[in-house]
A protein has these predicted regions:
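HhH-family (HhH-GPD) DNA N-glycosylase catalytic core used in base-excision repair
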Residues: 1-183
Length: 183
């Protein structure tokens, strides 16, 4: 499957924009420049592991396993556009930063989009894990949550299960969240 990308889009700059690609359940292959993720949840009929890469004018979506049906592919395309921020119109942003000597490089490199998670909940959990700690501790906390409380599919951890954490007692969640306790 291919998704047409916006004119001013850089796959590499977006996936490396602020570190989200380093946090589970995203996985990045920097040799082949692929971003891996398993989509799932109530919107899909099943779990859908994908690898995203860039072609000339499109983002290539490779399915790992059975190809999803038409309805799942439609929802998946919308989620991928959301994750890569295709819906962000950066024309005014580029016009403003293009006037500034120190920021003109952003226009030339199509920078400015920030990778985000498919759900607000996942972004919220990750943002909370960045508060008042180092990046190394953030990575440990997010990994502990995803790896200890999520499922694995095709070698990748599923984060949509984070949205189901409400049924867990706070003590159990804290044991998994605290860095270094479950090494």
């Amino acid at each position: 499957m291919f998704i047409t990308k916006p004119e001013n889009f850089s796959f590499r700059n977006t996936i490396h924009s602020h570190g989200w690609s380093e946090l589970n359940p995203f996985a990045i292959d920097e040799e082949k420049w692929r971003l891996k993720y398993v989509f799932g949840g109530n919107e899909f009929s099943r779990l859908i592991p994908v690898e995203l890469s860039e072609t000339n004018k499109k983002v290539k979506v490779e399915f790992k396993g059975r190809k999803p049906g038409k309805k799942d592919r439609t929802v998946l395309a919308a989620k991928i556009k959301h994750v890569l921020r295709f819906d962000e119109d950066l024309v005014d942003f580029y016009r403003l930063v293009g006037k500034e000597k120190d920021f003109a490089w952003m226009v030339k490199t199509n920078s400015g989009r920030l990778l985000r998670s498919p759900s607000v909940f996942e972004d919220l959990v990750k943002t909370i894990c960045t508060t008042n700690c180092s990046w190394a501790m953030t990575k440990i906390m997010v990994s502990n949550l995803v790896e200890k409380l999520g499922d694995v599919h095709g070698g990748l951890h599923l984060v949509q299960l984070l949205s189901e954490f409400g049924h867990l007692c706070p003590g159990r969640m804290l044991r998994h969240l605290q860095p270094g306790l479950l090494e």
